[in-house]
Amino acid sequence: VSGKLSRTMGGPAIRLYGRADGMVTVSVPDLDHPGDRWRRSLYLVGRRNYNLTLLSVFDQPKLSMNCTRRDTSAAVLQTLVLLNNTFLLEQAHSFAERVARSTRNPSKRIELAFRLALGRKPSREEASWSRELLEREIQRQLETAVEPEEADLEALASLCQMILNSNEFLHVG
């Protein structure tokens, strides 16, 4: 939904690296093309004990055995990752930029965000609290001396992050 996914098929594997804080992420300096950062996880180098941290939090199958059925879980760590992970915050911001490019009308932005992420229009109640969230976030951003256009985008990014964190989005398809 962020519009960042690279649909390039084939090519070399994407290397991972361990950061000083213990997180394992994509090794951006080793990429052949900047867009390779957004390739599907299928192209990540697979090692038994060296997996992308974000995927391991969300029940990535163990590479040391066959996986005929994926387990699902709900854990506090997943919620914390969804709220604070840099990658996910970047995706919410990219999602907001994608929506913002389409229209300036707040109601249409809300509807588009719901359609892109959840495949449906928001209910009246969802549309109402989404408008309230946008208005409140814009005011909060403006209080920090942010330019109005930036405040608008940051508020939309907050809405997009909220939609991406919804239970409905996590279980799409």
Predicted regions and their residues:
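An acidic, gly/pro-interrupted, aromatic-rich
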Residues: 1-117, 121, 158, 163-173
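Amphipathic alpha-helical segments that form the core helices of the histone-fold
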Residues: 117, 129-139
